[in-house]
Regions:
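Conserved transmembrane alpha-helices of multi-pass membrane proteins
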Residues: 50-68, 140-168, 195-209, 233-246, ...
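Peri-transmembrane interface segments
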Residues: 15-22, 33-65, 80-83, 228-243, ...
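Selective transmembrane-helix segments that form parts of the transport pathway or gating/packing helices
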Residues: 14-20, 106-124, 159, 163, ...
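N-terminal Sec/SRP start-transfer signal
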Residues: 1-28, 196-200, 257-276, 324-370, ...
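Interfacial "coupling" helices/loops that link adjacent transmembrane helices in transporter permeases
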Residues: 5-16, 26, 72-112, 189-195, ...
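Small-residue-rich transmembrane alpha-helices
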Residues: 29-40, 76-80, 113-142, 153-179, ...
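Alpha-helical transmembrane segments
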Residues: 29-61, 135, 325, 371-397, ...
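Basic-flanked hydrophobic alpha-helices used for secretion and membrane insertion
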Residues: 390-624, 701
């Protein structure tokens, strides 16, 4: 009998479960699509030089960890269904059915709908997995062909995860129904969150904000004490002193409110702190920009500290703005009677203000989560583009042997080996070479050998013949120098300002073989790999061969290109042999290393793909959670809204005006957290881009970055439009007579 009741209720309540089904279907689709490439049955043709195991295992771990966020979404959507059916449960209890039985019937209904969602989701996931496969094969540079395949282990893992989730949430729902009183079920629709003004949420946020402001004050004082110089330009002076004076003003305003809190309303305190947080966020965000522009002596730790300050100020801005939103609307309504009494605006203001007063905490959390989701969407292409561009610099040669003398303090212990173990292995495995260049890097002056200060390492030099050999390997034109000339080679990460400043100060250099003057062609920027430079330097001297013969060689490198790509298995074997003979830290203090383009590309592509898919998947999950919560917050109160709009109809309001009211209400409800999140995320992303602007310029390019950001924002807009339209349709049906 109960089985028939379950199926009848499920069939009758399909419309009520529509949001539940849609949300669960999206979750299952995403889970299956992203996890499909970790299947043991998935074997793309990516060539012998790649190993797919690293990517497969990493994807499985990353996706499963992020998917734990879906437990919250499943729980929230179930709570929505629980609230929606409270009256029905109350009637069943009054008719004599045990609440334990009611809970089990509800669990069975949600399980049926959940299994239906799993079936649809897996079917849709098969289609979506084609996009993931296309991304993967594009990353490996392989052609893509559509192939419709259902992976049994991925299907099993998907079913197990979601069924277990349904059971866990179902147990909690059953216990909730069992413990809920009938009178509470009947009045459930009238319950709201406590007003934010009466909760402890905002006072706690204010106290934490003031504590962090005190930290900001101490940091500003410390930076002025150790790094300030009266000769700094005016913008830098404002930055230094502003990061002291503004925290003082913030703390002073809070102290004034404490002394006169009977005369000054708590809302006025929040007003002042909101303004201070905005000003200080911009001041803190100016630190990396001014540091890069004027070469300020602020290290990475300080820049990271100010990133934390920016985040703190922006988080408080979100909390304060949402808290003040209803007050701002009330103030506008009071001061603008022409808007207040126009059409049905009085009804509209009442709807928005009452909802904001009772759901501000939820709106704040949604806004913060949206900021995180947007940042993940934007940061994913930046980080992967940075890594991919850096990979091109790191893997320019099939075999790259390099050394360092950072911990060598005796000249006889300097690296001077020719690394013949590489030659023997290549000969044994019949791997032919196209180019093979073993070369030294020299100190222009022997006295610089003991200079080991970080970021003040001496610039090393390469002979003209070795430099031309490397250029020939990479397909660049040969260069020439006069006997008393030198030129420079620069890393891609070096800025134009840094290069111009260096060349202006080094029109000539002293060497142990005499003085050299800067060539007419003073610099070259064609990338030759990062191991051709000394530690912590971005420039390399190119000197005539006869000069280098009289200099001290401190680094010995070897670059090889082969006729065919070295297989992954052979690269691993040779790497093991090399590290056994040349440990990373030798007893002499010399540092040795070897890089194979096969291994570099394999690990970088795998890590980049895992990072990109995990961040995009996580961002989509967070976005779906936020938009679902925003949607359900409106639909949960559909019963109350139906009565309110029916009263409005009886007062003579036209259906056209009611439709406009619904559109306005949903626009404010979706627009407030989303616009706030976009503004805050824009500041965070701008700060993030500013701190790594040199890397973006060198490895990605700002035009490419803008295209990636545009595509990302397009995805966000599509998600928003889908949820907004769905909510509008369901809401309109709910309030119709």
């Amino acid at each position: 009998m109960y089985a028939k009741l379950v199926f009848r209720n499920a069939k009758r309540s399909v419309k009520d479960y529509l949001v539940y089904i849609v949300t669960m279907t999206i979750c299952v689709t995403l889970f299956y699509a992203f996890l499909s490439i970790s299947s043991s049955y998935y074997s793309p043709d990516i060539g012998s030089e790649y190993d797919f195991t690293l990517l497969s295992d990493g994807m499985k771990i990353a996706i499963c960890m992020i998917t734990l966020l879906l437990l919250f979404l499943i729980r929230f959507v179930n709570h929505y269904m629980l609230r929606r059916k409270q009256k029905e449960f109350a009637v069943q209890s009054i008719m004599g059915m045990e609440q334990k039985t009611i809970g089990r019937i509800f669990f069975a209904e949600t399980l049926i709908m959940g299994m239906f969602s799993i079936l649809i989701g897996i079917f849709c996931g098969v289609f979506c997995s084609q996009f993931i496969t296309a991304m993967l094969l594009t990353a490996y540079g392989e052609p893509y062909e559509i192939s419709w395949t259902l992976f049994p282990d991925t299907v099993l893992l998907t079913v197990i995860f979601f069924v277990v989730s349904f059971f866990v949430v179902g147990v909690f729902n059953t216990r909730t129904i069992k413990k809920t009183k009938i009178i509470d079920m009947l009045s459930a629709e009238k319950e709201n969150e406590p007003e934010l003004k009466k909760s402890r949420f905002i006072p706690v946020v204010v106290i934490l904000f003031l504590m962090f402001t005190l930290w900001e004050l101490f940091s500003g004082i410390q930076n002025v004490r150790f790094y300030y110089d009266s000769r700094f330009v005016f913008p830098v002076k404002i930055m230094y002193w502003g990061n002291i004076l503004l925290p003082v003003v913030t703390l002073g305003w809070a102290a004034l409110w404490m002394l006169k809190k009977k005369k000054i309303a708590f809302q006025k305190l929040i007003d002042g702190l909101l303004i201070c947080s905005v000003l200080h966020a911009f001041l803190a965000a100016s630190v990396p920009a001014l540091t890069n522009q004027y070469y300020l002596p602020l290290h990475g730790g300080i820049l990271n500290q100010y990133l934390v300050f920016v985040l703190i100020d922006l988080l408080f801005f979100i909390c304060a703005l949402i808290y003040l939103a209803s007050s701002l609307i009330v103030a506008w309504k009071v001061k603008s009677p022409e808007h207040r009494y126009k059409g049905e605006n009085l009804f509209f203001f009442g709807q928005i203000i009452s909802k904001l007063n009772t759901t501000s905490k939820t709106m704040t959390l949604i806004c913060i989560t949206l900021v995180l989701a947007i940042f993940m969407f934007i940061a994913a292409p930046i980080l992967t583009g940075w890594s991919s561009g850096y990979l091109d610099i790191r893997s320019m040669y099939d075999v790259q042997v390099y050394s360092r003398y950072n911990d060598v303090y005796e000249e006889e212990n300097l690296p001077q080996d020719s690394y013949e173990i590489i030659t023997d292995f290549l000969t044994e495995h019949k791997i032919d070479t196209v180019y093979d260049c073993t070369f030294n890097l020299y100190l222009s002056e022997k006295d610089d050998f003991h200079n080991r200060q970080k970021y003040d390492f001496p610039i090393v030099a390469i002979s003209l013949s070795d430099y031309n050999t490397i250029r020939e390997m990479l397909g660049y034109e040969q260069i020439s120098l006069e006997e008393d000339e030198f030129t420079t080679q620069w890393k891609a990460i070096a800025t134009e300002e840094e290069r111009d400043s260096f060349l202006k100060e080094h029109t000539s250099i002293m060497t142990d073989a005499g003085e050299l003057t800067l060539s007419g062609q003073s610099y070259y920027e064609d990338p030759i790999g990062e191991t051709a430079y000394n530690s912590y330097t971005n420039v390399l001297y190119v000197l005539p061969d006869n000069i280098c013969e009289k200099l001290l060689p401190v680094i010995k490198n070897r670059y090889i290109t082969t006729t065919e790509n070295i297989s992954y298995e052979n690269a691993r074997k040779l790497e093991k042999l090399f590290t056994e003979k040349y440990p990373e830290q030798a007893e002499t203090g010399a540092i040795y290393g070897v890089r194979f383009s096969t291994l570099q590309i394999n690990s970088s592509i795998a890590n980049n793909f895992i990072l990109q898919t995990a961040m995009i998947y996580g961002a989509v999950v967070l976005m779906v959670i936020c938009l679902t919560v925003l949607s359900l917050q409106q639909l949960l109160d559909a019963g109350q809204y139906k009565y309110r709009f029916s009263v409005l109809r009886k007062l003579g309001a036209e259906e056209k005006h009611i439709g406009k009211l619904i559109l306005q209400q949903l626009s404010v409800w979706f627009g407030l957290p989303i616009i706030t999140a976009i503004i805050v995320a824009a500041v965070v992303i701008a700060y993030f881009i500013q701190t790594i602007s040199a890397e973006i310029s060198a490895y990605i390019g700002f035009s490419t970055l803008m295209l990636q950001i545009g595509a990302t924002m397009g995805i966000l807009v599509i998600l928003l439009i889908c949820y907004f339209i769905s909510t509008w349709i369901i809401f309109r049906r709910s309030v119709n007579p």
